[in-house]
Each structure stands twice: as structure tokens, then as C-alpha cells.
Regions:
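N-terminal pre-core extensions flanking Radical SAM catalytic domains
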Residues: 1-3, 8-10, 30-33, 226-239
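Canonical Radical SAM [4Fe-4S] cluster-binding loop centered on the CxxxCxxC motif
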Residues: 4-49
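Core AdoMet radical
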Residues: 36-51, 58-78, 88-107, 121-146, ...
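Short, flexible/disordered intra-domain loops and linkers
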Residues: 44-45, 78, 138-140, 170-171, ...
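Short amphipathic alpha-helices and their capping/turn segments at secondary-structure boundaries
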Residues: 52-58, 104-119, 174-183
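Distinct, well-ordered alpha-helical segments
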Residues: 76-85, 105-116, 137, 170-174
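Generic low-complexity, intrinsically disordered segments
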Residues: 94, 113-117, 153-155
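Conserved C-terminal portion of the radical SAM core fold
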Residues: 145-202, 208-232
């Protein structure tokens, strides 16, 4: 993939630095709407070289760092994980956010313990996309084989939702956000954008979201709304 912007600073709603690192690739790769897994490399040495350069930009200005890698934290190489820990200690990072697919939930406890040992609290985010199990599994192929939101949230702290898809309504989107806020600390709403998959954004559903749903949450400090997948400042093409 072309060079991308991999470091940014989020100044509103839970201010933090964010880095887009590169791993060996999402192990799931079955979500019908997602092509993020294309940002990967099988060469761990090359990944570490790239990731170390990105992590060198972290200043610790907010004491909070979000690490994303177009997959799950466990797909990052060991030297990169060591470097993340070193940067947290060196820059005074007290809160560290990672992403994780449901299939890797069994690895979360060890991750939390590792960083807790150096005084860093971890926050794990899962891409749920919707709490409508039939839509999530039959249409989106997320691979989360349970229906109970509380069970999904048991090992996670934050969730991502995906809106702007055919079949979604104002009521379904509001219900997803409310369910997310009930069971998770934070909710990140992503609006579908055109990518390389056959799944297309539905402009009518997006209009409904913008007019009837988003205004109720745009000022909620626990809800991030990304109209574009680059709104956090990473992922766009580097100049």
C-alpha cells in the first residue's frame, strides 16, 4: 500500500495521541465491508522498523495513546510491543488503547497484566458494528458468535459501530449507540465509505444518520463520530 499518515493527535473528546502501526495482517479477514487488512507485511523486521519510526513521534502530551494496526494487537511483532511499553514508560503514558477482534479475546488478560505491571491501564476496543446479531453475522460476517451485548463487552472497554449500510434505520442506529453506551465506556461510530469491497455506503441511510441520529450524540463526550475513516488523522495518504 502507498505510504500513509501514521501519527496524529486527537484534541477533542478523550484527547490522545494515535498511531497506525503495521502488523502481519488481520487473522480474520472475513468481514465483508473491510479492506484494512491490506495494510500488512509478512516481514516482521520491516514492520518493526516502520513502527519504531512512528512511535518515536509520540510525545506523551496527554498521557494517553491509542494504537491501531488494521487488525488486533496480537498481530504486532514482539519488538514492536516492547517498544510500545518502552515509549509508555519514557513518555509517561498512563492509558493505552488497543483494538482486538473477538477471536483473540483470550489474549486480553495477559496484555492487561503486562502493561499493568508498568503502571499503564489498557483499554480494549472491539469492532461490533451492530448489536443486531443476524445483520452482523449474516451480512457483515464479523465472527462474533454471541448475541448478549454484556457477554461481548465482558472483556472489552470500547466498541466500534458501523453505520450507513442498506437496511439500517434511525431506530436501529440509535439502539446500537444506546446499547453500546450501556455496556461499554466509549462508542466509536464509523460511517461507511467506499473502499475496495463490494459493500457500498447507502447515501439515504447516511442522510438519516446525519439528520436524525448524529445530532443527539455529536456533543456526547463518550461518542466519537467518524464521517470519514481518516477523521482521527491517520490512514490518509502521506504527502
Amino acid at each position: 500500500m502507498q505510504d500513509m499518515i501514521r501519527y496524529s493527535v486527537i484534541t477533542e473528546k478523550n484527547p490522545r495521541e494515535i498511531v497506525l502501526l503495521r502488523g502481519t495482517g488481520c487473522a480474520w479477514k472475513r468481514c465483508t465491508f473491510c479492506d484494512y487488512h491490506l495494510d500488512c507485511c509478512p516481514d516482521e523486521a520491516q514492520n518493526f522498523a516502520l513502527n519504531r519510526a512512528v512511535l518515536e513521534r509520540v510525545t506523551g502530551q496527554y498521557g494517553r495513546l491509542e494504537v491501531i494496526n488494521s487488525g488486533s494487537f496480537c498481530e504486532l511483532d514482539a519488538p514492536t510491543m516492547d517498544e510500545i511499553a518502552r515509549v509508555c514508560q519514557q513518555k509517561g503514558i498512563a492509558h493505552l488503547h488497543f483494538e482486538c477482534h473477538w477471536m483473540h479475546r483470550g489474549k486480553i488478560a495477559e496484555l492487561r497484566a503486562r502493561f499493568a505491571a508498568i503502571g499503564v491501564q489498557t483499554h480494549l476496543k472491539i469492532g461490533v458494528e451492530t448489536f443486531d446479531r443476524a445483520y452482523r453475522e449474516d451480512v457483515l460476517h464479523k465472527g462474533i458468535g454471541v448475541s448478549d451485548p454484556a457477554e461481548i463487552a465482558a472483556q472489552f472497554d470500547e466498541c466500534c459501530l458501523l453505520f450507513g449500510l442498506s437496511g439500517q434505520t434511525a431506530d436501529s442506529m440509535r439502539q446500537d449507540i444506546q446499547t453500546g453506551l450501556t455496556h461499554f465506556d466509549r462508542v466509536c461510530v464509523n460511517v461507511m465509505v467506499k473502499n475496495t469491497t463490494p459493500v457500498l455506503p447507502d447515501p439515504d441511510v447516511i442522510a438519516v444518520f446525519c439528520q436524525q441520529v448524529a445530532p443527539h450524540y455529536v456533543n456526547d463526550p463518550r461518542v466519537d463520530i467518524l464521517m470519514e475513516n481518516t477523521d482521527f488523522g491517520v490512514g490518509g495518504a502521506a504527502q
